[in-house]
């Protein structure tokens, strides 16, 4: 399959984009981004590069074309149909010991060089000219200089697939190592989690992970050592924002429960605006997915079926 030819045919046949617009994006697509920032969950701000409407259409079609061609490892839980942060946490819920690690500036660390390596590993062979055009459709040029560095953007619809595909070699090797030593391994985007019931088994993993990352990506992707955390049943264990309980279950955690309860109380007393009500509905839906028994208890606390009504969208 010629990827660019297939993409062009899909877009032009359906009059989704004009020929000259597509040709322009093949040459300067990496410049067609709107850039803004949003606050991070704990501190600082995250830069989002959002593709133009035409480029986004191209990327969505390209995503559909590449998806069946690129291997994604079974240990990957983010951006995979039928999987969620809940599924990711459940893998580790029966383990006493947990190790969490994190890739630094993950999406923006992924470059055309890494993608080219990934395409070859998936038996996708393109000419230099085809590769350059494909890279213009996938990557973002923050500097907007003629030969500026291209990186994967947070905000592009094709970035999740590319990020999972380029991690396949790492995921496979590290998962094989873990399987031999009775360790569970999952990756949720840039968050990697290891767990086991065998004491001290996780101690050497950070060094193994760092060495493998260097070997596989030549230093382009690195570990954020400040976020490497060991935990056990003696301490609070969290995986992708979900609490692991000592009875091998998952929970939204005490602080979230108190927060959600306060939102419902304010809602009953008509002290929430529209945005806050929508936020509360999202939190309730999240809690129902992770820990439905909590929603049942919350309903009993407020006696009337106010919580069920909120979840159903009733006023």
Swiss-Prot record:
Belongs to the bacterial reverse transcriptase family. It catalyses: DNA(n) + a 2'-deoxyribonucleoside 5'-triphosphate = DNA(n+1) + diphosphate. Its EC number is 2.7.7.49. It comes from Vibrio cholerae serotype O1 biovar El Tor. Keywords: Antiviral defense, Magnesium, Metal-binding, Nucleotidyltransferase, RNA-binding, RNA-directed DNA polymerase, Transferase. InterPro entries: DNA/RNA_pol_sf, GrpII_Intron_Splice-Mob/Def, Reverse_transcriptase_msDNA, RT_dom. Mg(2+) binds at residues 102, 190-191. It comes from the Bacteria. The gene is ret. This is Retron Vc95 reverse transcriptase. GO terms for molecular function: metal ion binding; RNA binding; RNA-directed DNA polymerase activity. It is an enzyme of class 2 (transferase). Reverse transcriptase (RT) component of antiviral defense system retron Vc95, composed of a non-coding RNA (ncRNA), this reverse transcriptase (RT), a probable ATPase and a putative HNH endonuclease. Expression of retron Vc95 confers protection against bacteriophages T2, T4 and T6. At multiplicity of infection (MOI) of 0.02 cultures slow growth when infected with T4 but do not collapse, at MOI 2 cultures enter growth stasis. Responsible for synthesis of msDNA (a branched molecule with RNA linked by a 2',5'-phosphodiester bond to ssDNA).
